Amino acid sequence: EWDAVKDTRQKCSGQLRFDAEFDRVYDVQSETQPNWILKDGSATLQISQSASWGQSVVWNPGADKCAQLKDMPATGYQRMLCVEAARVTSTIQVQPAQNWVGWQLLKL
């Protein structure tokens, strides 16, 4: 994984905690199992994506950056998390008459 805030690379496992700005890139592990399972009280959100994306970006602005964002309330970081399918480490090139497929599935 790449931590974009600290500009470091390290392997992480287990639960993620969001107590400050968080911006990390993770390699996609599987198309057949959820890449992310988010729990908030009794609600669970499973997020899967195609391996063709390559990576997932997980982002939360944290309190300091959120206070600077004009389109979010100052405490908005407490109730949001961005998890997006991405292709960060390499480009996707699609030639004429070819196609490329990438998907992300969110399941409650």
Model regions: which residues?
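Active-site/ligand-binding surface loops and adjacent short beta/alpha elements
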Residues: 1-56
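Intrinsically disordered, low-complexity segments enriched in polar/charged residues with Gly/Pro
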Residues: 22-24, 77-81, 93
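Short C-terminal domain-edge/linker segments immediately following a structured domain
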Residues: 27-28, 67, 79, 89
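Beta-strand secondary-structure signal
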Residues: 35, 82, 101-105
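Beta-strand-rich interaction surfaces with strong enrichment in secreted/lumenal proteins
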Residues: 35, 89-93
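Glycine-rich active-site loops that engage anionic ligands at enzyme catalytic sites
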Residues: 40, 44-81
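Carbohydrate-interacting regions of secretory-pathway proteins
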Residues: 80-81, 85-90, 98-99
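Short Pro-Gly-centered flexible turn/kink motifs
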Residues: 93-108
